[in-house]
Regions:
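Short aromatic/hydrophobic "clamp" motif used to bind/position activated sugar donors
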Residues: 114
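Active-site acidic Asp-centered loop
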Residues: 117-118
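A conserved hydrophobic helix/loop-capping motif in glycosyltransferases and polysaccharide synthases
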Residues: 21-34
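Active-site-proximal specificity loops/subdomain of glycosyltransferases
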Residues: 59-108
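Short loop->beta transition adjacent to catalytic acidic/histidine clusters or analogous donor-positioning motifs
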Residues: 19-21, 48-58, 73
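Catalytic core and acceptor-binding pocket of nucleotide-sugar-dependent glycosyltransferases
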Residues: 123-129, 135-287
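Short, well-formed alpha-helical segments that are part of the catalytic scaffolds
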Residues: 31-50
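Membrane-proximal basic amphipathic "stem/tether" segments
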Residues: 1-9, 271-341
Length: 341
């Protein structure tokens, strides 16, 4: 039986002063505000406001216009690896861009702690810069020296959305050596990630038709675990086999800590909040996360896994949203079939 993971209140985490922090801001340079999506200069200004003594590193692409950007200590540009094309949904998958720009920025970080941030976000406080220094680190699956703090956005609760190995990669705060460990990984092979023939999934509230084996968060997490000799082969994005689920719970509760996104001190723009269900209901909350960490007995684990299985195979059929998505899936499938003829 796994040992309980005691997760204290976020208010009991240790705040880290900005003079001990490097901030890696990664992504494209945004010169114009679109709706409530800030410019890169606004991002930099917010970081300087709330983390005044931090080492600020901007990691972007070769050829980007970085003139007149104020508040940068170090700038690094990289060749743009480009997106991986989803030929069914006709949109880009930017996992390789995220890996490269984050990894290159982290290579310049010299402080003990690091905040991984994006060029289209702003800070509203320094609350994200907190660490659970009381965490027990000798247990199996404790891969970081200290847990990495993230916001709750996109840390999927499998009892609602049956997805595992899905931590948040938008904002992360932890020891620099731990973030380097997480992001020090190769570029994803498009021929592996994109199937020659798409798969049709009719189970789960997130039913769909896609050629992608897994989503970016899962790719990055699985590659990180493989470097630690923890090998998990998900059949698809919504694979929730009991064995994989059990491993994920241990990895999640022993290596990550959550701040509820609305109280994290990070301003998420509407583009990241455009689907209210996926930001308000589909993710762990601080309270649910801490409770699950404490309840590590086998019966509790079975109950949580059973809820995830019910969500995938039964409960989805009782939501109108599921049928709307199923209709969109059918239209995607029909369009793909016509294209192949």
């Amino acid at each position: 039986m796994a040992k309980p993971v005691i997760i204290p209140s976020v208010d009991d985490f240790s705040p880290i002063s900005s003079d001990r922090v490097s901030v890696v801001i990664q992504g494209p340079i945004l010169r114009e505000r679109v709706g409530d999506r800030p410019t890169t200069q606004e991002c930099l200004r917010s970081v300087r406001t709330y983390l005044p003594e931090a080492e600020v590193i901007l990691s972007t692409w070769d050829g980007s216009d970085t003139t007149d950007l104020a508040g940068i200590d170090k700038l690094i540009t990289s060749p743009d690896p480009g997106p991986i094309w989803n030929y069914v949904k006709l949109r880009d998958n930017n996992v390789n861009r995220m890996i490269r720009s984050t990894n290159r920025g982290l290579a310049l970080a010299t402080r003990e702690y690091c905040l991984k941030f994006r060029t289209d976000l702003c800070l509203t406080s320094d609350r994200i810069c907190r660490i659970d220094t009381s965490a027990e680190r000798s247990a199996p699956y404790s891969l970081f020296s200290l847990p990495v703090t993230t916001t709750s956005y996109y840390v999927r609760d499998p009892s609602v959305i049956p997805m595992i190995f899905h931590p948040s990669d938008i904002v992360q705060f932890g020891r620099t050596c731990d973030l380097v460990d997480f992001w020090n990984q190769p570029q994803v092979d498009p021929h592996w990630l994109v199937r020659a023939r798409p798969i049709l999934s009719i189970f789960g509230r997130y039913a769909g038709f896609t050629p992608m084996r897994v989503v970016p968060e899962q790719v990055v997490t699985l590659q990180w675990l493989a470097r630690h000799n923890i090998h998990v082969a998900l059949q698809d994005t919504f694979d929730i086999s009991f064995k994989a689920y059990r491993i994920w719970e241990q990895v999640l509760f022993r290596n990550f800590r959550l701040l509820d996104a609305v109280d994290s001190g990070v301003a998420f723009h509407a583009r990241l909040r455009r689907k209210k269900f996926f930001t308000d209901r589909a993710n762990f909350t601080e309270t649910v996360f801490a409770k699950a960490g404490r309840e590590q007995s086998l019966p509790h684990l079975w109950i949580r896994w059973a809820r995830a299985a019910l969500s995938k195979y039964v409960i989805c059929f009782f939501y109108l949203r599921y049928y709307k998505r199923l209709w969109r899936t059918y239209r995607l499938y029909s369009a793909w079939v016509r294209q192949k003829k």
